[in-house]
């Protein structure tokens, strides 16, 4: 049976669920308390991350490399429990590159369901039963008739610490804002009804690329100048203005609402505070949504509003406390094991896995710790830095020049180096493997249609066109542009004996076929016929253009006539037995087969009728 805030069972007799904190943490060391206090449902890897973050003076998550407000516990827990952080935690543990917030946003916007992307990155958990036993800090627990229930802590009003009967007596009034990519939706609920709502979409991110245009511009690669980039940049600015306009129009409602739920990327949050809506950065009413959401629209907002009101049942109070006691003991033992192992191994990295094989183990055997498996992973050996005299800034500029096909700037960039570094720089251009796909500069030039740089690398730098990237493709296969492929083919023609061309995938150039006299004669006749057709087409085009000019002159002449002159011309043609004038009386264009008429006038459209009546009210 599902319960909500509107369930009649909770109108009275609701008591907060209390934990004996002194008994729970009794005998625990300072390090253990840090681990035990991480009341989250993200497993042991999340608790270790929590301990690491508390020991540093920073405002950035070291796993996701994104800003996090460590002064707000709710925001902190919401980040650590999010799919974004859990995904990056697993990827980092497997020595994989972590997602940026923009890339992960692009994955959520893609056509594939987010569940499939979890499967792709291997986001499966073996700790589901263990996680379910933890007491999440983002939920508020209460007791009713000997059973334990919980609601999202975010729905409590400012100043409320625990759930009471008042929580269920009042309407669930709030404002919800969802913004992801170019999709925005907002709504306000008053007296349990949606009173105002607004949703729209703008093109601000390239399909399946992830990230809005402003994030791409600030990524260090320079602002793109394509028509699509300019359109996305314009749409993003208009989108911000529309959102601020909506919030300004709702200002009086927003100042009265007790809760504000906002779900958006971190770099978009300031937009809500900059609007003239009376919302400040540290507004105590602002809440995060404690679950994943889909594409922003009005239906999704309604679904969020319903899910925020759901009440979860956790069984009898005695059973629930017994489960908590068991979990507390397991966490104490694991904390001691982790702390001792860390002191012993020093620089070792630890990955702790939990096994539930001891669920039925006798209590007298608590000292056994075979259910804790501790693996140690040695730090990888430091790799030798290639080309040490070429700093990161120089390499980044080189990469940008190649992408922009600025070969002259690239040459000047190389010439700025000392003579003793030139050979090292040329070796870097020939052999550098650029992450994440281990692409060479030939791959980068071909993929970005940088034809000038491509010729420079082939003919002057002598780059190897058979070197393959991380996907096993040579530079020739990195582009579908026919002009780029022609550069590779021309290079092969000039250097046919240079090496094994089969490895480069560059095809042989087409050989010219010797024609017989008859074939040459037929080819000449076809060219002659084609030329005649082209000449006839040009002649016809000129005639049409001439007729259009004459028609425009006649039309302009007719439009410039006064009403008296038009009527006189019509009478003269009727008396002379000539056909009537088949032109619109207002704009002068030729009339359609069935013109619009009123009085004795003919018009081409209703707009012309309206304009004529407006100009001639009598």
Curated annotation (Swiss-Prot):
One of its GO terms (biological process) is ERAD pathway. Residues 502-539 are annotated as: Disordered. It holds the Pfam family VATC. Residues 510-557 form a coiled coil. Its EC number is 3.1.-.-. ANK repeats lie at residues 437-466, 470-496. One of its GO terms (molecular function) is zinc ion binding. The active site is at residue 213. It is found in: Cytoplasm; Mitochondrion. One of its GO terms (cellular component) is cytoplasm. Residues 170-311 form the VLRF1 domain. The keyword Hydrolase applies. Residues 505-515 have a biased composition (Basic and acidic residues). InterPro entries: ANKZ1/VMS1, VATC, VLRF1/Vms1, Znf_C2H2_type. The keyword Zinc applies. A zinc finger (C2H2-type) spans 59-85. Keywords: ANK repeat, Coiled coil, Cytoplasm, Endonuclease, Hydrolase, Metal-binding, Mitochondrion, Nuclease, Repeat, Zinc, Zinc-finger. The VLRF1 domain mediates binding to the 60S ribosomal subunit. Endonuclease that cleaves polypeptidyl-tRNAs downstream of the ribosome-associated quality control (RQC) pathway to release incompletely synthesized polypeptides for degradation. The RQC pathway disassembles aberrantly stalled translation complexes to recycle or degrade the constituent parts. Dispensable for viability and growth but is required for protection against oxidative stress and for wild-type life span. PANTHER family: ANKYRIN REPEAT AND ZINC FINGER DOMAIN-CONTAINING PROTEIN 1, TRNA ENDONUCLEASE ANKZF1. Belongs to the ANKZF1/VMS1 family. This is tRNA endonuclease vms-1. It comes from Caenorhabditis elegans.
């Amino acid at each position: 049976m599902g319960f909500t805030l509107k369930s009649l069972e909770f109108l009275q007799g609701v008591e907060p669920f209390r934990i004996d904190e002194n008994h729970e943490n009794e005998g625990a060391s300072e390090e253990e308390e840090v681990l035990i206090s991480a009341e989250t449902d993200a497993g042991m890897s999340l608790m270790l991350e929590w301990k690491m973050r508390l020991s540093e003076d920073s405002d950035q998550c070291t796993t996701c490399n994104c800003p996090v407000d460590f002064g707000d516990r709710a925001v902190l827990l919401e980040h650590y429990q999010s799919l974004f952080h859990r995904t990056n935690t697993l990827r980092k543990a497997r020595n994989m590159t972590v997602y940026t917030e923009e890339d992960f946003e692009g994955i959520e916007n893609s056509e594939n369901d987010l569940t499939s992307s979890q499967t792709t990155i291997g986001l499966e958990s073996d700790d589901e039963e263990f996680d379910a036993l933890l007491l999440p800090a983002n939920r508020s627990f209460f007791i009713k008739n000997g059973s334990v229930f919980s609601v999202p802590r975010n729905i409590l009003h400012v100043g409320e610490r625990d759930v009471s009967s008042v929580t269920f007596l009042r309407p669930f009034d709030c404002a919800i804002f969802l913004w992801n990519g170019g999709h925005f939706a907002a709504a306000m609920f008053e007296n349990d009804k949606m009173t105002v709502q607004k949703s729209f979409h703008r093109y601000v991110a390239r399909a399946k690329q992830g990230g809005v245009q402003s994030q791409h511009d600030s990524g260090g690669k320079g602002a793109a100048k394509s028509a699509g980039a300019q359109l996305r940049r314009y749409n993003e600015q208009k989108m911000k203005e529309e959102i601020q306009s909506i919030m300004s129009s709702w200002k009086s409602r927003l100042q009265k609402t007790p809760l504000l739920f906002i779900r958006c990327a971190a770099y978009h949050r300031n937009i809500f505070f900059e609007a003239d809506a009376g919302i400040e950065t540290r507004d105590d009413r602002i809440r995060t949504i404690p679950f994943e959401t889909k594409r922003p629209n009005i239906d999704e907002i309604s679904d969020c509003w319903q899910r925020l009101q759901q009440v979860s049942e956790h069984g009898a109070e005695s059973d629930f406390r017994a489960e908590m006691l068991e979990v507390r003991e397991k966490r104490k033992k694991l904390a001691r094991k982790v702390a001792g192992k860390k002191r012993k191994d020093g620089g070792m990295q630890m990955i702790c896995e939990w096994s539930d094989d001891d669920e039925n183990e006798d209590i007298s055997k608590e000292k056994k710790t075979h259910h804790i498996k501790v693996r140690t992973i040695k730090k990888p050996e430091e790799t030798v830095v290639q080309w040490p005299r070429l700093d990161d800034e120089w390499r980044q500029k080189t990469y940008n020049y190649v992408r922009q096909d600025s070969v002259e700037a690239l040459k000047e960039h190389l010439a700025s180096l000392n003579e003793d570094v030139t050979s090292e720089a040329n070796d870097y251009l020939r052999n550098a493997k650029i992450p994440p796909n281990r692409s060479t500069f030939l791959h980068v030039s071909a993929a970005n249609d940088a034809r000038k740089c491509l010729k420079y690398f082939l003919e002057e730098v002598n780059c190897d066109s058979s070197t393959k990237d991380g996907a096993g493709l040579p530079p020739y296969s990195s582009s579908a542009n026919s002009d780029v492929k022609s550069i590779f083919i021309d290079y092969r023609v000039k250097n046919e004996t240079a090496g094994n061309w089969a490895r480069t995938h560059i095809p042989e150039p087409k050989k010219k076929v010797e024609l017989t006299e008859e074939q040459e004669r037929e080819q000449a006749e076809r060219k002659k016929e084609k030329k005649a057709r082209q000449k006839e087409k040009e002649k016809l085009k000129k005639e049409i253009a001439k007729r259009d000019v004459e028609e425009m002159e006649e039309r302009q002449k007719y439009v410039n006539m006064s009403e008296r002159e038009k009527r006189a011309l019509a009478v003269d043609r009727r008396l002379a037995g000539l056909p009537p004038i088949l032109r619109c009386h207002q704009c002068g264009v030729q009339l359609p087969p069935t013109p619009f008429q009123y009085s004795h006038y003919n018009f081409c459209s209703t707009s012309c009728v309206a304009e004529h009546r407006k100009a001639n009210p009598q």
